[in-house]
Amino acid sequence: MNDNARLEPVPVDAHDGLLALFHAAPVVALGEAHWLDQQHRLIQELLFDERLAETVDAIVVEFGNALHQPLIDRYLAGDDVAPRQLRRVWSECVGGWFSRAFESPVYAEFFETVRSVRLARRSERPQVLLGDPPFDPLDGVGAVELALGQRDEHFARVVAREVLAHGHRALLVAGSGHLTRRSDVREGNVVQRLEREAPGCCTVVLPHYVFEDVVERRRSDIAKLERKLERWKPPAIAPIRDTWLGEVDATLYLSDTARLVEPDGTEIEIPTPLLDDAGRVLERVSLADVADAYLYLGPIDSLTLAEPPGRAVEEP
C-alpha cells in the first residue's frame, strides 16, 4: 500500500455522519458486529435523536424473524405483548437458531427503545422491518435448512418491496457479510442484490471491529492500522474512497473463513473466500471494494461484547 498516494480520511461525529449519508443514497447499510456494546450504544443514541425519524422511514434488521412482523408491529405501537411471545421475535431467527447469536440483551433493548421513543413522540416512525426469513421451529430441521438458504434473498426482498418501491429511506442493520459490496455468496448478499436492481441505492458502512481469531493472526496489521486511527475521537465516521483506508486488506474485517454451528452444537470452520460478480475467487480485496464509509468506535482492545446470558464464546 502506498500511503503517500492516498488522502487522509476526514472523520466526523458518527451521529451526524451517518445521518448525512442519506443525502447520497436512500439506503444506508450498517454492518453490525454482533453483540458489540459500543455500536449498539450508538444505535440507541440515534434512536433518541429526533433527526433519525425525520430522515428514515424504516430500520430493517437481521435480528428479527419475519414470521413475527405482526407481533412486533403491535408491540411497537404500544400494545401489551407477553415477554415470552415477544422474545420469539429475535430468539427464533434462523440466522442464530443454533448459535443463539441474537439472544444478547442488545437486541431486546433495541426493540424496547424503538417502542419507548415512538410512544413518547406519538409517532409511527421509524418502522421496524424484520429481515430474517419467516421460519417456525416447530416445522423441524428441514425448515431451518430451507430458511438458512433464503436469508440474503429475503432481506433484500423486504427492502425492495417495503422501502425502495415506495421511494422511502431505510437504515439496514445486519452482520457485515450480508451488506458488503463483495461477499462469499455466489448469488449475492443483500447489498449486491439491491444494487443489481437499483444501482447506487446503497451506502455501505463497515465498523472498526476484527474477530478474535483474526486478531490472533494479524496483530501487526491491526497495530499499524490503529496507529493511524489514534487521533480519531470515537464514535466517528469517514468516507473510505480515495483515502489510505481504502487500500486496507478487506479480509482483516471479512475473514476468509467462518465458523458454523451444527445442530448438535459442534462448531466447524469453513473457507469463505470473497467472489467477483462471476463467482470467481478474488485474490486481493481492499476496503474500498467492499464499503463506502468507516465507523470507528474505539481501539479494538477497548471494545466490549454483550454476550447472551450463560454463553461465553470467542466471537459472535
Which residue ranges define each predicted feature?
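Compositional signal for N-terminal targeting/processing segments
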Residues: 1-316
